[in-house]
Amino acid sequence: GLGNTAFYTTDAANLATPYYNTPQGPQRMHEGLRVALPEEMAGGEVLFSPARALNAEAYPSGGAGMVGDADDVLQLVEALRSGGQGILQPDTVALLRSPHVGAQAQTQGPGWGFGFGGALLVDAEAAQTPQHVGTLTWGGVYGHSWFFDPQAQLSVVILTNTAFEGMCGRYPQQIRDAVYAALQG
């Protein structure tokens, strides 16, 4: 099971110190911090609450409120890539991995559509990515990103503690490119 993943933890030692990007470099995040989303994400801002990770009464937000470790996240991503593995029914996984909104969604830029599970690659050439059509990806505002590529039989989890770089900055792209370069030999 996913023994280290929940919507809160009782042990602050389980948490990394959160940071956010600034032109001067990463800055330590504080309670109530408002940070503008990158322009490519249609603007707006995020109100951060690092303390929510220690609050069992906080709203259980899957987009900005889960805590967990790399092993658990990889186990979940692998289950999605390989058809459910007893965590989800295969029909549910098929829905998560199907394009419900086409490339017009462009949540990750050109070439990306959207399924129930996140951004779904519908045109690798337009996206300028080494990933294959059918790759599913998503991330979280506190600085994580993950993707799986069913054709390459590959799952990748990137856990950082820096918003928004770890979610949608150059770092996840550099990791992606390094992984695919290594696969090419």
Task: Kindly label every feature range from the protein language model.
Residues 140-142:
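Short, small/polar residue-rich loop motifs at catalytic or cofactor-binding pockets
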Residues 11, 150-152:
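Short acidic-glycine loop/turn motifs at beta-strand connectors
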Residues 146, 153-161:
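Short, well-ordered beta-strand elements
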Residues 130-136:
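Short, hydrophobic/aromatic-rich segments at coil-to-beta transitions
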